[in-house]
């Protein structure tokens, strides 16, 4: 990894339906083998079913962002070698990484669910995340619990 230049952040274009950059980024993480149209149909289908379940005045984009906010971790542990021992040091998570982790965790836990289509899995996982339950929220809680347990090593921060 080069120390001279940091990689330039690529600009992600907003999605065509809602004009939201975060939804576009979510689609890019969900996408397999460059099949963006498949990822789009899954995400839009999941957001449509969220709208149907939320009532007539439910905004699917607002629910999506609420689900993401409920999954975003505030703190995580990173390994730090001191002497011969490796310590799990709790560190605060940068905002970009928070979003990336939340997106990744929601998609991972949606893929592990038992519903028939990915659209259903994703909409149910997002609904669970809005209501502060589900596998993605549990992952965030586990991360926070791990950081809390290793609070004693927080002075090893870098």
From Swiss-Prot:
Q: State the source organism's domain of life.
A: Bacteria
The record's listing under Pfam families reads: Ribosomal_S7
- Keywords in alphabetical order, please: Ribonucleoprotein, Ribosomal protein, RNA-binding, rRNA-binding, tRNA-binding
Keyword Ribonucleoprotein assigned to the entry: answer is yes
Q: Under the GO molecular function aspect, what terms does this record hold? A: rRNA binding; structural constituent of ribosome; tRNA binding
Concerning SUPFAM superfamilies, the annotation shows: Ribosomal protein S7 (SSF47973)
Give the CC-aspect GO terms. small ribosomal subunit
Q: List GO BP terms, alphabetically.
A: translation
Per its database record, what is this protein's job?
Answer: One of the primary rRNA binding proteins, it binds directly to 16S rRNA where it nucleates assembly of the head domain of the 30S subunit. Is located at the subunit interface close to the decoding center, probably blocks exit of the E-site tRNA.
The text of the family note is: Belongs to the universal ribosomal protein uS7 family.
Q: How does it assemble?
A: Part of the 30S ribosomal subunit. Contacts proteins S9 and S11.
Q: What is this protein called?
A: Small ribosomal subunit protein uS7
* Naturally occurring in which organism (per UniProt): Acidiphilium cryptum (strain JF-5)
